[in-house]
């Protein structure tokens, strides 16, 4: 076995699951009202941290951080409010093809009913309305989807799978909001991203498609959108979906000075059996660290003992955690 294959195999064993998706927010109470009242997430834990260990983990000096862990179905998100220092807002002209774009795909049992529910709560549209992807596309035909925004402007998606697509548990008739299938990120080049997520982290490809046409344009609200989509999976948990815009190539890169307290910051939290092995795999691929190294966390706050944050080739944050 060559060195790259050995590294990939070792790290594939170290990454046990996609534990959660972290989202930075500006006002925790406002966000909780949205995620638990407009959407039916349930609060699992709520706490604050400060101190040197968390500064070195998050790459933000002088932080005081509140984290609320929420559950929908079997999946988890973590809302993060930096009480200090405050970060920057999402650019008002953000588009779905900018490379800081990330969303979670919430599966619903009835698209029309879910959309009506969101309309009653006056959610901000990111799509023109729900779209049904055309049947000529064998890997996506029949999927219904709609993009909207949370109070900070973060993109979210509701999605309904037809009977022949998606995990069997997404075909239930109730509840209306079933869980999170994946988080999607915009990437500049799929092959470059696969070297990170597949070859270094050990995720497997679960499906691929090329989507275009008026339905896709209106879903993303990007004229002329043509996407290469690659679905990836860890051994457990929701997936990671790579979105490469083959057209238009006008999406802007992740700001090089992005910090975890900036409101466009999301992070994919992978549970690892050994964060040292994860760190070695990231370092072997010459990918960037956010953390100063693997950080031992005092008092096992949030049930975490050790953690490391790095960045993928496009600057999306990835965290390896030991619980």
Put a short name on every predicted segment.
Residues 2-30, 45, 101-106, 159-194, ...:
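N-terminal beta-strand motif that seeds the catalytic metal site of vicinal oxygen chelate
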Residues 17-26, 64-79, 84, 90-118, ...:
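Vicinal oxygen chelate
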Residues 18, 39-41, 76-79, 148, ...:
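Fold-core signature of tandem repeat domains
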Residues 24-75, 113, 120, 136-141, ...:
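Core segments of cupin and vicinal oxygen chelate
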Residues 47-64, 84-102, 119-121, 126-144, ...:
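A cross-kingdom feature marking solvent-exposed beta-strand/loop segments within repeated
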Residues 111-117, 124-128, 155:
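Short secondary-structure capping/junction motifs at helix and strand boundaries
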Residues 140, 150-152, 160:
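A charged, solvent-exposed segment within the mature domains of Sec-exported extracytoplasmic proteins
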């Amino acid at each position: 076995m060559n060195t790259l294959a050995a590294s990939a195999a070792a790290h594939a064993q170290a990454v046990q699951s996609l534990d959660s998706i972290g989202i930075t927010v500006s006002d925790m109470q406002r966000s909780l009202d949205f995620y638990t009242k407009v959407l039916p997430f349930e609060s699992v834990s709520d706490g604050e941290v400060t101190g040197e260990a968390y500064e070195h983990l998050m790459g933000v000096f002088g932080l005081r951080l509140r984290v609320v862990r929420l559950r929908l179905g079997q999946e988890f998100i973590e809302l993060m409010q930096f009480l200090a220092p405050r970060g920057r807002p999402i650019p008002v002209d953000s588009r779905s093809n900018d490379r800081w774009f990330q969303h979670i795909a919430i599966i619903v049992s009835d698209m029309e009913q879910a959309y009506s529910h969101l309309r009653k709560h006056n959610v901000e549209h990111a799509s023109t309305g729900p779209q049904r992807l055309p049947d000529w596309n064998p890997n996506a035909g029949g999927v219904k989807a709609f993009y909207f925004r949370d109070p900070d402007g973060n993109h979210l998606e509701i999605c309904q799978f037809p009977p022949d697509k998606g995990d069997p548990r997404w075909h239930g008739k109730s509840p209306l909001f079933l869980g999170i299938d994946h988080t999607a990120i915009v990437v500049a080049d799929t092959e470059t991203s696969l070297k990170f997520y597949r070859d270094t982290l050990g995720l497997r490809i679960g499906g691929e498609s090329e989507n275009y046409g008026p339905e896709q344009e209106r879903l993303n609200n990007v004229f002329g959108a043509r996407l290469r989509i690659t679905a990836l999976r860890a051994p457990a948990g929701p997936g990671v979906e790579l979105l490469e815009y083959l057209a238009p190539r006008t999406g802007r890169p992740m700001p090089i000075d992005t910090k975890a307290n900036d409101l466009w910051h999301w992070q994919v939290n992978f549970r690892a059996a050994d964060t040292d092995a994860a760190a070695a795999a990231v370092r072997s691929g010459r990918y960037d660290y956010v953390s100063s190294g693997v950080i031992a966390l005092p008092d096992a706050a949030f049930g975490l003992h050790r953690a490391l944050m790095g960045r993928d080739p496009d600057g999306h944050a990835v965290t390896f955690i030991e619980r």
